[in-house]
């Protein structure tokens, strides 16, 4: 979700972060149907680093540039195969589907916040022992425990 805190407007779509070099490099290039927003977290607040290109884009997108305090410094609907640089230095860039700017009623100086959509990992069952050394593995009254693949590496018991 992306919120224009100044206007009290919200966009209830999926939000992903581009907070690494590779994620920022990939961006939304070659995405056929842009149905989510991508928030670029830049390493420094500058105009040059906040410049974007629309090469290899398959559709137009809305772009919002924010300074380090999350205030809008520039915004526009970006067309395919063009270059864009914000009017002022920016630390964050929000790219999303056309209509995002209209929905949020964005104007320069607005305060914008976002909540990244949690990406759920595939779950794997994990064998476990209950405290007190009671093993419920194989028991009819067992407790099924599941943890994220990223968080737990299941060991064979």
Curated annotation (Swiss-Prot):
**Which residues span the membrane?**
none
**Top-level taxonomic group:** Archaea
Disulfide-bonded cysteines = none
Pfam families this protein is in? Answer: DUF192
- According to the entry, what is the taxonomic lineage of the organism? Archaea, Methanobacteriati, Methanobacteriota, Thermococci, Thermococcales
Task: Indicate what this protein is called per its UniProt record.
Answer: UPF0127 protein TK1120
Which family does the entry's similarity section mention?
Answer: Belongs to the UPF0127 family.
């Amino acid at each position: 979700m992306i919120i224009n805190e100044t206007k009290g407007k919200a966009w209830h779509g999926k939000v992903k972060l581009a907070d690494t070099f590779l994620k920022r490099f990939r961006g939304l290039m070659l995405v056929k149907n842009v149905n989510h927003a991508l928030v670029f977290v830049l390493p420094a607040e500058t105009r040059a680093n906040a410049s974007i290109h629309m090469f290899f884009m398959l559709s137009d997108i809305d772009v919002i540039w924010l300074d380090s305090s999350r205030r809008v410094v520039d915004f526009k609907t970006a067309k395919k195969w063009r270059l864009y640089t914000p009017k002022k230095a920016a630390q964050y860039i929000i790219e999303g589907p056309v209509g995002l700017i209209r929905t949020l009623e964005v104007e320069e100086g607005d305060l914008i916040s976002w909540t990244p959509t949690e990406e759920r990992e595939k779950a794997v069952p994990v064998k476990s022992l209950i405290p007190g050394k009671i093993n419920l593995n194989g028991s009819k009254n067992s407790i099924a425990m599941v943890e994220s693949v990223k968080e737990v590496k299941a060991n064979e018991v």
